[in-house]
């Protein structure tokens, strides 16, 4: 999957979990938590969505690598075909 | 006999709502617990359940109409005089809803809850922010397929369908925390919170207690458990807190109930309300029904669904009216402790700060341990500090031993 394609997919997963967030306002380099109060429930839902969408099981210990859109893309690009 | 279906009060801080959509028409048979109407409030769109079986005779309030709590929304033909169903104590409102005109609010049994689920599945789920954006763009939400949780329509879905161009990147950066409609909803919600909290501070003589406790064993138990189950079955620490509060309410009377007209009444079942922060401002505290009886995995799934629906604006009237005690966790905000305000007519609220490593004395030595500060605000008209201290200590004991939750 191309980097842009992956980023777009991840963004739609994030705004699916947080339907009150306008995708056009999400800044890739800033943590979700700092941008729109993404909390532990949102992170869990995101991990569940990643599992559903890509079959990737992200261990709890690696949640910090999902903190922003840029970090997600870096973390997942070699895990997602 | 003819029966009136009125807009129920949804906790102490709601006094009006706008009928958005009827799921039933005259002639339709309805069953107790069925979601018959969607009402837009400061807390988002609320699914309102009917509280008795019958046949709809007349729809009184048309969609688009804003009405106060207690207004007759519809009339239905019912069988014999309604036998007393299992009702949550009707919340006492501050506004026009107060008094005998308010419909009782139903606490659904799991079976009837499913009936409501089916009824609501047929129409679009949409967040309040997305609904506002749809209105702005002139998009018919009925024509959209939602891509959000449970098929909910998101802002993105609305924008894709709408004619207006998206905001530019520059503008977007400035307004990262502002989403469409969030301000409008937050404004109404702010007023509702202000009314309820002012009333609480005027009327309820609060006392406050706090207790720090070592939860290292619970944190390790949770990490080990979550590492050994699929991602869909992971628990959050908050689930342990919710269950610990519920079980402690069974152990000690005087914390899970309602104070009305000078009298305290213990709630027959413990319904722990969970304070959920809404992005863009405000909060709601819907209940996990009959919390003490739920095994942790069931409780966690209910909690997850509840937070998702609270943020998507899809709560049920019964969930908003039911809480007999509230848990507010500010651990995410990384504060040490919370000193919360009771939401009337409840008589207690439990607070939780962040879990984190602190210096702790173990066997005469200082060690880094995982510590959480629990707090309790309770109503001095009902309990005293000594009982409150025992209650809080019991919650701490229960959290520290999660394998027994």
Region roles according to the model:
Chain A
Residues 46:
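Short active-site alpha-helical segment characteristic of glycosyltransferases
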Residues 17-37, 54-61, 65:
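Phosphopantetheine carrier-protein modules
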Residues 1-23, 76-80:
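Thiotemplate assembly-line natural product biosynthesis machinery
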Residues 40:
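Catalytic nucleophile serine of serine hydrolases
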């Amino acid at each position: 999957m191309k980097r842009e394609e992956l980023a777009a997919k991840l963004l739609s997963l994030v705004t699916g979990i947080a339907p009150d967030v306008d995708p056009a306002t999400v800044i890739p380099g800033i943590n979700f938590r700092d941008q729109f109060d993404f909390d532990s429930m949102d992170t869990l839902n995101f991990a569940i969505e990643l599992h559903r969408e890509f079959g990737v099981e992200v261990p709890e210990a690696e949640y910090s690598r999902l903190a922003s859109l840029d970090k997600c893309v870096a973390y997942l690009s070699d895990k997602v075909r | 006999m003819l029966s009136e279906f009125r807009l129920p009060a949804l906790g102490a801080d709601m006094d009006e709502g706008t009928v958005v959509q009827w799921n039933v028409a005259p002639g339709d048979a309805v069953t107790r617990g069925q979601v018959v109407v969607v009402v837009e409030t400061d807390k988002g769109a609320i699914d309102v359940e009917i509280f008795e079986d019958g046949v709809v005779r007349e729809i009184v309030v048309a969609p688009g109409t804003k009405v106060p709590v207690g207004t007759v929304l519809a009339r239905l033909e019912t069988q014999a005089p309604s036998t007393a169903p299992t009702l949550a104590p009707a919340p006492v409102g501050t506004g026009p809803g107060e008094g005998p005109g308010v419909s009782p609010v139903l606490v659904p049994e799991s079976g009837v809850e499913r009936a409501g689920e089916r009824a609501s599945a047929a129409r679009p789920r949409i967040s309040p922010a997305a609904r506002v954006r749809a209105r702005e763009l002139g998009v018919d939400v009925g024509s959209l397929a939602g891509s959000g949780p449970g098929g909910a329509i998101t802002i993105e879905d609305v924008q894709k369908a709408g004619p207006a161009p998206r905001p530019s990147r520059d503008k977007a950066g400035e307004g990262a925390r502002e989403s469409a409609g969030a301000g409008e909803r937050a404004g109404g919600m702010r007023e509702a919170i202000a009314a309820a909290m002012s009333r609480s501070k005027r009327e309820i003589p609060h006392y406050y207690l706090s207790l720090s406790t070592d939860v290292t064993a619970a944190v390790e138990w949770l990490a080990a458990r979550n590492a050994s189950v699929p991602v869909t079955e992971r628990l959050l620490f908050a689930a342990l807190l919710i269950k610990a509060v519920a079980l402690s309410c069974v152990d000690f009377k005087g914390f899970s109930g309602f104070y009305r007209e000078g009298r305290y009444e213990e709630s027959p079942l413990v319904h722990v309300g969970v304070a959920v922060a809404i992005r863009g401002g405000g909060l709601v505290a819907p209940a996990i029904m009959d919390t003490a009886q739920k095994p942790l995995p069931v409780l966690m799934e209910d909690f997850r669904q509840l937070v998702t629906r609270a943020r998507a604006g899809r709560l049920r009237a019964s969930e908003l009216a039911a809480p007999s005690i509230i848990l507010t966790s500010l651990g995410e905000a990384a504060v040490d402790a919370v000193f919360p305000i009771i939401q009337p007519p409840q008589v207690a609220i439990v607070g939780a700060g962040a879990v984190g490593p602190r210096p702790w004395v173990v066997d005469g030595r200082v060690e880094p341990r995982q510590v959480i500060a629990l707090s309790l605000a309770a109503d001095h008209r009902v309990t005293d500090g000594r009982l409150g201290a025992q209650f809080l200590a019991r919650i701490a004991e229960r959290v520290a031993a999660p394998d027994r939750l």
